[in-house]
Swiss-Prot record:
This is Phosphate acyltransferase. HAMAP family: PlsX. One of its GO terms (biological process) is fatty acid biosynthetic process. One of its GO terms (molecular function) is phosphate:acyl-[acyl carrier protein] acyltransferase activity. Pathway: Lipid metabolism; phospholipid metabolism. It comes from Carboxydothermus hydrogenoformans (strain ATCC BAA-161 / DSM 6008 / Z-2901). It comes from the Bacteria. Keywords: Cytoplasm, Lipid biosynthesis, Lipid metabolism, Phospholipid biosynthesis, Phospholipid metabolism, Transferase. It is an enzyme of class 2 (transferase). InterPro entries: FA_synthesis, Phospholipid_synth_PlsX-like.
Length: 330
């Protein structure tokens, strides 16, 4: 059973509830919706089997998108905290929220605790590439990190891809401003030899221009750089389609070309749409926690829950707990 924060996100609770119902209709999995009960019930519009698989737990407090984590963690009657408690107590196998990222992360660390050996939990998110997808870690959880943190990110990411995606030896690259060893700032220069020595599958530095070529399965970065990469990629993809619409597919000739290319363009747009991936796991806490985009609508919620189910069923958490995260151990 999974638990969902019904009040998190720009379009909560309506789009969250609709996405949950779509997921339940498709999979038959049980879901607990946590939030203001009266508001949730107003959105439970679908009939059929989904209603029998959805439980509601009331939570009077709401963590807003602008709220500071230090304030959010004090709200013990919020949908975030109550949902995480269900995971801690073993009632639910995973927690999903499209709410305030910082608040969810801080609450998860406080409520669930960190896995032994992990100093900084990190967000790992898929990015589309020419050959499929690559995974970026950290996508925004940690602005300031040390080399040992980046090492731990790489280890966690490899465990995730090996278990949830059955990639036997994931290729790991370190994001830098040049491919050669010795390029980068002080953090990158100190991290490179650690990954080179201790990470099987480490292929060296990767430049920004190669992220979407599919040369690596995992790209390691601090959360400041990683989040900029993520948001830049999202913005660029959206801008390209706006440009095509405004500058290319106009007039009779452009409209005809758009009609001919419609199927191909829809496939490309689908691959670039964050809603197709749905959510990103927070690795390093003692439980399965997925954080979705604040703009998530029903499609993103449904898909995010599907990925979270896959992660739970893979046994990822048990394997991560076995991991050796001590960078200084001989």
């Amino acid at each position: 059973m999974l638990v969902v924060d019904a009040m998190g996100g720009d379009y909560a609770p309506r789009e969250i509830v609709l996405g949950v119902q779509d997921f339940v209709e498709e999979t038959g999995e049980k879901i607990v919706l946590v939030g203001r009960e009266n508001e949730i019930k107003k959105e439970l519009t679908k009939k059929g089997k989904s209603l029998g698989y959805i439980e509601i737990i009331n939570a009077d407090e709401v963590v807003t998108m602008e709220e500071k984590p230090t304030v959010a963690i004090k709200k013990k009657e919020s949908s975030v905290w109550k949902g995480l408690q269900l995971v801690r107590e073993g009632v639910a196998q995973g927690f999903f929220s499209a709410g305030n990222t910082g608040a969810v992360m801080a609450s998860a660390v406080l409520c669930l605790g960190k896995i032994n050996g992990i100093d900084r939990p990190a967000i790992i998110t898929p990015l589309p590439t020419l050959t499929g997808q690559t995974f970026l870690i950290d996508a925004g959880a940690n602005v300031d990190v040390k080399p040992e943190n980046l090492f731990q990110f790489a280890v966690m990411a490899q465990v995730y891809l090996k278990t949830a995606y059955q990639i036997k030896n994931p290729r790991v690259a370190l994001l830098s401003n040049g491919e050669e060893e010795g390029k980068g700032n002080d953090l990158i220069k100190k991290t490179f030899p650690i990954l080179k020595e201790k990470i099987s599958g480490f292929i060296g530095n990767i430049e920004g221009k190669d992220i979407f070529r599919g040369v690596a399965d995992i790209i390691v970065a601090d959360g400041f750089v990683g989040n900029i990469v993520l948001k830049t990629g999202e913005g660029l993809a959206e801008s390209i389609f706006v440009l095509l619409k405004n500058e290319v597919f106009t007039g009779l000739r452009g409209s005809l070309g758009g009609f001919i290319l419609r199927e191909s363009l829809q496939k490309i747009k689908k691959r670039l749409d964050y809603a197709e991936y749905g959510g990103a796991p927070l690795l390093g806490v003692n439980g399965i926690v997925f954080i979705a985009h604040g703009r998530s609508r029903r499609l993103a919620v449904r898909n995010g829950l599907k990925v979270m189910t896959k992660t739970v069923e893979s046994g990822f958490l048990a394997e991560l707990i076995k991991g050796d995260f001590n960078v200084w151990k001989d």
